[in-house]
Structure formats: structure tokens, C-alpha cells
């Protein structure tokens, strides 16, 4: 199957301010994707990791490496933060797509379990 990569997310954000940066005609894209072999759509631009579906296809929105946007700032505007940067790992398996958001900011260990 195909992995489709677009810069602007083809789905709205939970924040009205961030939704301004979404793809302009997502319904046109959805119409083209129906019945296609696209397994996942990857995007970014918002600097906030997220997930959704478009035409029944999973959409993974990557966070930002340079900075992270504050999704809790909500509809007051846009606030960039120096913490909470991340990237997304995508693994393709027969019949499955798995995504994982990986934080890259400094953090403290709460607990650790060593196996093996």
C-alpha cells in the first residue's frame, strides 16, 4: 500500500486557531482516496501530535522538533513552547499500521522496569 505525505493536516484540529492551518479542500482529497491503496496519511505543520481518519484512512499528525505548540492555549491564539518537542515513528505491518509519538525534550524518569 501507499503512504501519503502532506504538509498541512487534511483534518481539522481540536483547536479552532490551529484548524486555520489545515488542508484547504480535504473533501476533494477524501474523494480521490476512497478505494485507493493508501494505508496512512502523514502530516505535520501544527507542531502538535494528533491522529484522525480521512475517508477511513488513518491520519498521523507529527509534533515539532524545533518547538511544540501549546494545544491547551485553545482559541486565544498560538503559543510556541520550548518543551514537548517530539517526532512520530510509523511502522507498517501486513494489515496494520502502528504509530508512536516519541518525546525528545529533557524529562525525569518516574519509574523503570528492566526486562531480560
What positions do the PLM features span?
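His/acidic metal-ligating clusters that form di-metal
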Residues: 1-60, 89, 96-97, 113
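Binuclear metal-dependent phosphoesterase catalytic core
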Residues: 53-116
